[in-house]
């Protein structure tokens, strides 16, 4: 006998089928919003190499220089080529979970710093919740190594009426002069010395520290697309390895500017022994380079990786020419600020950078 389903039975069957399909898809793929929100960081386990057992945590969050690209590239390189465990943290939209460095108050996953051997900071004007900021402060107060990239000299910014216990980390602080940048890295934000996006940098090796282990395999000069930053407050105790000269254009063949800045070379890369608010001393390395295009320069990458070795207590493992070949490709984007709508359209999450930009 032919069975003809009733409207009621067909409706029940359809509801069950749809429910099953939704549940199956969710179990296999997860919803886009939930998957993005749950994905806090890029975590890469190191392979064999001198960095095995060491944990490097990258804290990114700046609007101009594509730190999410450059620092992820270094994490892949350090993990695959040299054995370091690496975690990369990103500024994200708290609702969608997508990467958006315009979100100045949200960098999830900072608890990863509890196990960090080195913190790499590439952030600008952040005002993080006190609970999150505490992880950064704890790292510094323990005297652990810090590697600051370009905007890290002005990583934090608080409103004048802030009651946060970390308000003095502001780059304009007068109570803790110059805040985190000046006290931990050696200087706070001063100004662009070269013209932004119009005058590139040619960095020259400093003769006083020519034999420094971190300079092994690094050329005498390094070209960067980013302009020279003013750095005015370093002390004689700070070790300047490179100084930056302003070029008249954005190409490595461009001549130096022909004005009063022609013979001025600002600190470009240096080591410092800092004293934390706790009174404990630690070590930092800073470079005013940092745009994603800058890292196409092999010698700059080698300087960065060698500095990580040094800060990790592995200076003796720095070879004659540290391997800094890319892992998974590297196609950096130009410098420039993007709108919230543009970041939402890109829909980038940490896993996007697991093996190179798509």
Pin down the residues of each PLM region.
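Bacterial N-terminal signal peptides
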Residues: 16-31
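N-terminal secretory signal peptides that target proteins for export/translocation
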Residues: 1-14
């Amino acid at each position: 006998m032919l069975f003809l389903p009733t409207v009621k039975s067909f409706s029940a069957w359809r509801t069950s089928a749809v429910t099953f399909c939704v549940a199956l898809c969710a179990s296999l793929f997860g919803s886009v919003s939930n998957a993005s929100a749950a994905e806090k960081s890029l975590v890469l386990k190191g392979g064999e190499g001198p960095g095995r057992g060491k944990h490097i945590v990258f804290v990114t969050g700046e609007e101009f220089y594509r730190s999410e690209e450059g620092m992820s590239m270094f994490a892949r390189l350090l993990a695959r080529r040299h054995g370091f465990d690496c975690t990369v943290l990103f500024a994200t939209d708290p609702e969608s979970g997508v990467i958006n460095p315009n979100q100045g108050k949200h960098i999830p996953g900072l608890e990863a710093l509890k196990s960090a051997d080195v913190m790499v900071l590439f952030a600008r004007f952040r005002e993080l919740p006190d609970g999150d900021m505490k992880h950064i402060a704890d790292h510094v107060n323990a005297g652990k190594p810090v590697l600051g990239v370009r905007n890290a000299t002005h990583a934090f910014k608080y409103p004048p009426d802030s009651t946060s216990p970390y308000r003095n980390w502001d780059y304009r602080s007068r109570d803790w002069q110059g805040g985190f940048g000046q006290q931990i890295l050696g200087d706070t934000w001063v100004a662009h010395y070269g013209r932004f996006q119009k005058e590139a940098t040619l960095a020259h090796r400093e003769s006083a520290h020519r034999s420094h282990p971190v300079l092994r395999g690094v050329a005498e000069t390094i070209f960067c697309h980013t302009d020279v930053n003013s750095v005015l407050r370093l002390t004689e105790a700070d070790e300047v390895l490179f100084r930056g000269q302003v070029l008249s254009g954005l190409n490595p063949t461009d001549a130096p500017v022909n004005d009063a800045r022609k013979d001025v070379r600002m600190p470009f890369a240096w080591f410092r022994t800092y004293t934390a608010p706790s009174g404990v001393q630690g070590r930092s390395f800073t470079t005013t380079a940092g745009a994603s295009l800058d890292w196409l320069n092999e010698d700059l990458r080698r300087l960065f990786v060698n500095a990580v070795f040094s800060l990790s207590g592995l200076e003796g493992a720095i070879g004659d020419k540290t391997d800094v070949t890319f892992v998974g490709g590297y196609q950096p984007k130009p410098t420039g600020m993007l709108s919230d709508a543009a970041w939402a359209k890109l829909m980038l999450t940490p896993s996007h950078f697991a093996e190179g930009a798509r």
